[in-house]
Amino acid sequence: MSFADTLRQLSSAEDFFSALHVDYDPQILNVARLHILRKMRLYLEADKGDLADESLQKQQYQHYLAQAYNDFVHSSPIKERLFKVHQEAVKPVKLPMVKLTSLTMPPE
């Protein structure tokens, strides 16, 4: 069976990590599974390398899956904004801190 055929049979994020021999923390994967796979796909699309050799192709997929996973170890799905719902969400506005000493009580 070819590497491409093997990938087509995978049905979960855990399957991809297992097939590509990439270690992961289940807690991180439970939160960001779709985001990680999408980010991996974006990395693969950006790389215009030759994928004729299956061993090189597997190494490339393994590298980009590990890189995408690592992105979400240090970030979050909301910060990465890969999906439309996150891209269109309003970024939270950082409000300036107000010192407690500047607050006054209203007159009675």
Swiss-Prot record:
Name of a matching Pfam family: NifW
UniProt KW keywords: Nitrogen fixation
The keyword Transmembrane appears for this protein: no
UniProt record, GO biological process: nitrogen fixation
Highest taxon, organism lineage: Bacteria
Family: Belongs to the NifW family.
Subunit structure: Homotrimer; associates with NifD.
HAMAP family registered for this protein in UniProt: NifW
General function of this protein: May protect the nitrogenase Fe-Mo protein from oxidative damage.
The protein, known as: Nitrogenase-stabilizing/protective protein NifW
Gene: nifW
